Amino acid sequence: MVKLLPAQEAAKIYHTNYVRNSRAVGVMWGTLTICFSVLVMALFIQPYWIGDSVNTPQAGYFGLFSYCVGNVLSSELICKGGPLDFSSIPSRAFKTAMFFVALGMFLIIGSIICFSLFFICNTATVYKICAWMQLAAATGLMIGCLVYPDGWDSSEVRRMCGEQTGKYTLGHCTIRWAFMLAILSIGDALILSFLAFVLGYRQDKLLPDDYKADGTEEV
């Protein structure tokens, strides 16, 4: 007859594997969060949210706060705008979108800064703090992406994209890679947030009741 491991020893083995797997997933989550922050910073800074096409009257492209539009008399692009130069941003919708995307970016960066709390606070609590921050970041990115097209009816955008351009109607222009990444980043932030919540609750239950030792009784 095969003798099984004592309940206490089996619980220790399960606990060791449980902790090891949780740490591996935690490292993966942290690495993905850092990579995601770089992605969000890039799409925030780059002015390639919408741009020209072969049918546009002029060449150019627009971002959240900066844009470049071709000169009628030459092929040179005239660039304007900056994150602190609100007067040069073409529309209120662009300003609002910039605010919410920036909010999402800083929340993601803030969740990375919270990694330092792992050394001084309860691990489960830190995961949950980061999860809420990443969920809020996803909300900010989503609002930014929804509001941004509301500014397509500005005079600067219409000058480049044509008179058919209006709110949520891009005319002859096309969506560029930064806007596409911003839309995809909403899902990324939600996945990271969900993963952080799972890790937080796993930390709360590192040793489930079913595996708690109930003495040295052998079966």
Curated annotation (Swiss-Prot):
Q: Where does it localize? A: Cell membrane
Q: Does the keyword Glycoprotein apply?
A: no
Membrane topology (Cytoplasmic):
1-24, 121-128, 200-219
> What is the topology of this protein in the membrane according to its UniProt annotation?
Multi-pass membrane protein
Task: Give the matching InterPro entries.
Answer: LHFPL
Q: Which GO terms describe its cellular component?
A: apical plasma membrane; plasma membrane; stereocilium tip
State the Pfam families in the record. Answer: L_HMGIC_fpl
At the top level, the lineage of the source is: Eukaryota
Residue ranges of the TM segments: 25-45, 100-120, 129-149, 179-199
Q: Which residues lie on this side of the membrane: Extracellular?
A: 46-99, 150-178
Q: Which PANTHER family match?
A: LHFPL TETRASPAN SUBFAMILY MEMBER 5 PROTEIN (PTHR12489:SF18), LIPOMA HMGIC FUSION PARTNER-LIKE PROTEIN (PTHR12489)
* Function of the molecule: Auxiliary subunit of the mechanotransducer (MET) non-specific cation channel complex located at the tips of the shorter stereocilia of cochlear hair cells and that mediates sensory transduction in the auditory system. The MET complex is composed of two dimeric pore-forming ion-conducting transmembrane TMC (TMC1 or TMC2) subunits, and aided by several auxiliary proteins including LHFPL5, TMIE, CIB2/3 and TOMT, and the tip-link PCDH15. Functionally couples PCDH15 to the transduction channel.
Its recorded name reads: LHFPL tetraspan subfamily member 5 protein
Quick one: which gene encodes this? Answer: LHFPL5
